[in-house]
């Protein structure tokens, strides 16, 4: 269990004036150097190690800019991810992804992000990849800054698995949605504990699911009615 009697947060509060008057979501535009490196990796022009080195360099540069801007909470810009939310899900057992053929509707165009779906019972049996991502960031913490880890909210995870194109796969392994909800919750507990053990004291849950649910076209998209969305 997590012991909150004495944490890095308490030490941080003693050295930095709180509450903060400003913060940022933590996701930043990828520099051209990083975007090119990812393309080169996908086309097998560079190795995974070379891509990681470039990610490290770009994150280091970003953190310097964050500190120069006066931010008390720093992030890695989500520079190691393909998308802001799906990479986190890919770190769970029972979740797979493939290149999309149709994309996901987004503001009148198709976002060509990987189709992500369930291929087994959801859980976390090993160390989640985001833990190592966070450990790299902790080297930049000082008396004025603390590292923040951003992850999609559990509701975002659930919504991904009940989207029309993913629902068929989900039903193969979960006849009861409540069972899926519980497995997702248990998986989050494991990852949060792993992050805590790695020194993380600031986690941000990003949730865009509500915006989709209140859209007037949501019942049609989810093949249900207003009551079904509740």
What are these regions (language model features)?
Residues 3-230:
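Domain-level signal for soluble alpha/beta catalytic cores
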